[in-house]
Amino acid sequence: MPSQTLKIENARYVVTLDVERRIIRDGSILVEGRRIRRVGKAAELAGTPADRVIDAHHLVVTPGFVNGHMHISYAHAVRGIFPDDLGSPLGHVFRLQMAMTEEEEYYTTLLGLVELLRNGTVCFVDPGSTKHPDACLQAYEDAGIRVILGECVSDREAPFPLPRHGTEEAIARTASFLEKWDGRLEGRLRAWAMPFSPETCSADLLRGVKRVADERGTGLTLHHNSGPEARRESLVRHGLRPTEHLESIGVLGPNVLLSHALGLDEAEIECLARTGTAVAMCPVTAAKGGRGVAEHGRMPELLARGVRVALGCDSPNNSNHLDLVRTMNMAAIQYKDARRDMRQIPAERALEMATLMGAQALGLGDEQGSVAPGKRADLVLFDTRRPEWQALFNPVNNLVYNADGRSVHTVIVDGRVVVDAYRQSFVDEDRLFARVQEIGERLLVRTGVTLPGSRWPIV
């Protein structure tokens, strides 16, 4: 049976992210099966037949977004419960997460997938927070999204209820997870090694799971260096900065993605550049959490040294949204203010981090991240018939500085339309919203988690 064809016809702009970074006015795209076959001016593809044609005269097309650090699991059920003066929420996070049943995690994951797709994310890394992957597999399959999963492992005591195992058991569990999950859903699901952090994992564990990832040709991600406190602790414990410590034990490299990476200094940036290690930065989480981005953030220096940087939304209770357009905006503006230099992180670079560079950080740059023949057909179509898109002269500026995910009109993953004219068809949203509200209410009662409510009276 021949592959189905899809034509996106006469787009107002196609922002390709190809080698030349072309923006094609009045562009068309031909998709055959799961891949892009042709990209060019509408006149060049005029008359080319397709099984389905999308009239895109009012749409701006970009590559699908890549979310490099996104805890998909529990948080939708209890979103917004953490007050501004809580401090670290991690104790509550793991208490709530570990209490979730398979059914509860399935529905909260499903809601997360709805939000990701409706905001243009086609691929994300869940850094080990999914407790019941067997239960969530159907949600990933129905949604049609790309996902990178792993089992969170640690072998040291943590100041919060993190799952802990013996070193050899943790390595074996990682190997078993990769064997079971990597490559499922016709390749849309990848499995990585996911030690939680250098503070909660011994050097033997980190070396062991890195070896497993290398042997299987897959990746490794971990939370890393989330501020100057982590640097001080590492200097006391190892006599080395956190990134230098990872390099010294052989746990850096092109298949490693360090998440957050906020408290880096010049020596650590050099480690990352020298080893080809990538980072996933969560600018909204960092700003909302008061992490001192203006003082400790080093995104411009990382980019200047050629380090691959992905963007992440982190969690619905950290950034509190799963909208990479808003995340791009934060990445583009916060360093302009911090450095008092409007040239920092231009809009084009922010879009690169959410698309092509983000895919490269995940080792997927050959397959996705740009609108080019041979690439996977992962595309987002933005509706310019909205006030925030007016007037339109520079589509990248309008996207990064004007818009947000609410203008996502259509999303295509692997050649399949998964959001069609603002609507997804894999779940009844009203019923899902009601179900997740009930789950959250039950979860808070069951765990005994109580936090201050609204500062203003609810009457």
Question: What is the role of each PLM region?
Answer:
Residues 144-146, 214-219, 251-254, 271-280, ...:
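Glycine-enriched alpha-helix->loop->beta-strand junction motifs that scaffold or abut catalytic
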Residues 76-107, 148-171, 228-255, 275-278, ...:
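Active-site gating loops and adjacent loop-to-helix segments of metal-dependent hydrolytic enzymes
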Residues 1-27, 32-37, 42, 352-459:
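Active-site microenvironment of metallo-dependent hydrolases
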Residues 228-240, 268-274, 290-302, 317-336, ...:
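Histidine/acidic-residue-rich catalytic or RNA/ligand-binding cores of hydrolases
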Residues 248-255, 300-386, 402-404:
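His/Asp/Glu-enriched, well-ordered alpha-helical/loop segment
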Residues 78-145, 170-184, 437-445:
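Alpha-helical scaffold segments that flank or form the walls of functional sites
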Residues 136-269:
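Metal-coordinating catalytic core of metallo-dependent amide/deamination hydrolases
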